[in-house]
Amino acid sequence: MKEKLLIRLFVESDAGAVQDIIHRGLREVNGKDYPAELIEEHCAYFTLEKIKSQAVSAHMYVAVSGDKIVGTGSIAPYWGSEKESILLTIYVFPEMIGEGIGSAIVNTLEQDEYFLRANRIEIPSSITAIEFYRKMGYAFKNGLCIQKRHDS
């Protein structure tokens, strides 16, 4: 990554770029671990309307390098709880994985008010991203999800 990375809150005009990042991440990265039909179901789920809706119910961030959005991630209350939060849709352009963008997004989410007030963080992680979250200090729960506990 040559340009300085800026992480900022999502604005509605970011939806198309965010959708592209999510779809490419699903197809090019997660597609190695999941059947094509499941990947396409997930791509169909992430419509522009769904992304805009998630940005209303969550705090959605985008990572910008130069004038290009290169990553995204969100945090929201977990089922409306003030003591638990959930990290959602953390994706980076496939060709930029390993450049620290995903870590920068998670670090930003960890400074968000939803993270800071929570006693527990849930991440519905893909198989593909498990090792990334482990490196970020998260651990398995029930062999499926990932969680991180901290003092509030």
Question: In which residue ranges do the predicted regions lie?
Answer:
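Short alpha-helical functional segments enriched in proximate histidine and acidic residues
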Residues: 25, 112, 132
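Conserved GNAT acetyl-CoA-binding A-motif
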Residues: 106, 113-126
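Residues forming the Rossmann-fold NAD(P)(H) cofactor-binding site
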Residues: 99, 103
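Conserved catalytic-core motifs of GNAT/GCN5-like acyltransferases
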Residues: 120-124, 134, 139-152
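Basic/polar N-terminal segments that are highly enriched at the extreme N-terminus
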Residues: 1-3
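Conserved short alpha-helix immediately C-terminal to the canonical SAM/SAH-binding motif I
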Residues: 105, 129-132
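Short secondary-structure capping/turn micro-motifs that flank functional sites
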Residues: 71, 129-130, 149-150
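Acetyl-CoA-dependent GNAT
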Residues: 5, 9-13, 20-95, 106-108, ...
